[in-house]
């Protein structure tokens, strides 16, 4: 109706008042404040204002943009732009949840996996190194970590999924930037929290403490904030136990990296095995090959974390796919926790096409639904255009999950080899079969600019890549026939491998044009 929608801002003051002194040209800019907004209402102006009379200035940390992404899917491209603006607007010396309502807090759970995806778009290393210090400083004497740090809001809920961000962000800094210092600096504090949670909340080898559940799953009604249908929600003990197991695997890696932690590896191994055994004993349904109440989240977590009995993985995955494709008609049904691993798990187990469907949907619930309804950032809720304004931010990034990671690693094929952190060796393995016709992406790594620009025309692939100095790449092509492949217009030599129906080249730094005919999709 032409009026501003401010009901969802709660009691945040959204009005700036300036009194003209009435002498010539006057220029005014507010200080010590920022507003999150899309539209502005002007009153008291003596003439009809024009856009030239006002300048909107972006207030965010001085962080370099490091990533670009474009594909053949316009919806995916706009989602990327929305993510860029949303992330950018929430960098304020710490990663906050929203820039507009009376909150603006650095919630840990919003960045558990989000920090990883953001690292492809922005050089966020310094920001997150500093944030780890904030988290460490907020830790209690007995080891507890808050849900918000710095702990302006003193939410010491002692759940697993939000405080666990302390560990996952350190892992992101190591994987993306080869930063070992954060592990050395924070290892003792992270272990202290692990031990604290075990001592206080581990009962019969299962983690009993959970606070938020799979936060913000798409509700059954467009007017609801949270789902009331129990079939949509995942058991908190299942979530917490699986996530705690996942964090123990990261801590085991940290212990191997950090000389002071090598004696702890046996501790993490033993605790992990106990939890895995108890987890499967309680939550795995042998008859149905599913976990808990068979939500997508209940199944995706044990799949992503390697907790499923080896001979049951394919069955559990089939169950999960059935839920996505049939029960939810090819749409998202996960909340903040499940969405962190959804896209990559679908691709890893061979359904990149289904992941692409989720990424390109424009009907509720989906990221594309936000775009279709005029969003220019990412909403707090999947139904942000209709939900109760009590909790309905129009600029949150927590629902991105692992989408941006999937964009870069699975669509563009720009992934750091875990064995050589910081993109010393790049794994270039796009899911060509997903359904896109082309992707053009770049990422400014610590070694330099990485480019991946591929285009498929029927059964022919043209792929232009750039590998920075002092780095190398494993390049995966959708063929097993080397005679169909040329690199810089030269036939492939004998120095290649065949791995799971893909031809793999190891290339040193440089720029290449790869042509592959008769490719498999």
Indicate where each model-derived feature is located.
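Extracellular/oxidizing-compartment recognition motifs
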Residues: 1-101, 109, 126-127, 146-150, ...
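Repeat-solenoid scaffold signature
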Residues: 327-369
């Amino acid at each position: 109706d032409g009026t501003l929608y401010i009901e969802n801002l709660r009691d945040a003051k959204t009005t700036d008042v300036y009194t003209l002194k009435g002498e010539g040209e006057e220029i005014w800019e507010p200080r010590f404040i920022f507003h999150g907004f899309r539209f502005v209402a002007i009153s008291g102006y003596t003439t009809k204002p024009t856009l030239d009379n006002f300048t909107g200035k972006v207030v965010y940390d001085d962080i370099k943009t490091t990533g670009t992404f474009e594909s053949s899917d316009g919806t995916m491209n706009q989602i990327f732009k929305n993510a860029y603006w949303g992330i950018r607007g929430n960098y304020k010396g710490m990663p906050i949840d929203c820039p507009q309502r009376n909150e603006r807090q650095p919630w840990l759970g919003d960045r558990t996996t989000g920090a990883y995806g953001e690292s492809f778009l922005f050089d966020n290393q310094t920001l997150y190194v500093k944030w780890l210090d904030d988290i460490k400083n907020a830790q209690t004497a007995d080891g507890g970590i808050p849900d918000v740090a710095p702990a302006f809001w003193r939410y010491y809920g002692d759940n697993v999924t939000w405080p666990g961000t302390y560990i996952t962000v350190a892992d992101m800094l190591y994987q993306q930037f080869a930063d070992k210092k954060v592990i050395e600096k924070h290892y003792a504090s992270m272990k202290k929290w692990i031990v604290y949670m075990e001592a206080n909340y581990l009962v019969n080898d299962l983690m009993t403490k959970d606070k938020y559940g799979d936060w913000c799953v798409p509700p059954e009604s467009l007017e609801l904030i949270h789902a009331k249908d129990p079939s949509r929600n995942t058991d908190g003990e299942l979530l917490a136990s699986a996530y705690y197991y996942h964090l123990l695997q990261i801590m085991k890696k940290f212990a191997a990296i950090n000389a002071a932690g090598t004696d702890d590896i046996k501790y993490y191994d033993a605790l992990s095995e106990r939890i895995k055994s108890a987890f499967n004993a309680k939550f795995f349904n042998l008859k149905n090959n599913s976990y808990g109440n068979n939500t997508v989240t209940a199944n995706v977590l044990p799949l992503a974390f390697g907790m499923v009995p080896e001979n049951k993985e394919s069955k559990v995955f089939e169950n999960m796919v059935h839920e996505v494709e049939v029960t939810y008609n090819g749409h998202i049904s996960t909340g903040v926790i499940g969405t962190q691993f959804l896209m990559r798990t679908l691709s890893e187990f061979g359904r990149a096409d289904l992941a692409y469907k989720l990424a390109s949907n424009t009907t509720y619930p989906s990221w594309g639904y936000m775009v279709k309804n005029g969003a220019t950032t990412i909403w707090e809720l999947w139904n942000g255009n209709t939900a109760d304004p009590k909790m309905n931010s129009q600029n949150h990034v927590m629902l991105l999950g692992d989408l941006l990671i999937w964009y870069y690693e699975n669509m563009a094929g720009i992934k750091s080899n875990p064995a050589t952190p910081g993109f010393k060796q790049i794994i270039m393995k796009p899911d060509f079969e997903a359904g896109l016709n082309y992707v053009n992406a770049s990422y400014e790594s610590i070694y330099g600019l990485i480019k991946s620009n591929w285009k498929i025309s029927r059964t022919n692939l043209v792929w232009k890549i750039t590998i920075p100095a002092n780095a190398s790449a494993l390049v995966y092509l959708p063929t097993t026939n080397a005679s169909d492949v040329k690199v810089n217009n030269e036939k492939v030599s004998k120095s290649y491998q065949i791995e799971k129906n893909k031809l793999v080249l190891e290339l040193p730094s440089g720029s290449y044009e790869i042509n592959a005919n008769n490719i498999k999709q």
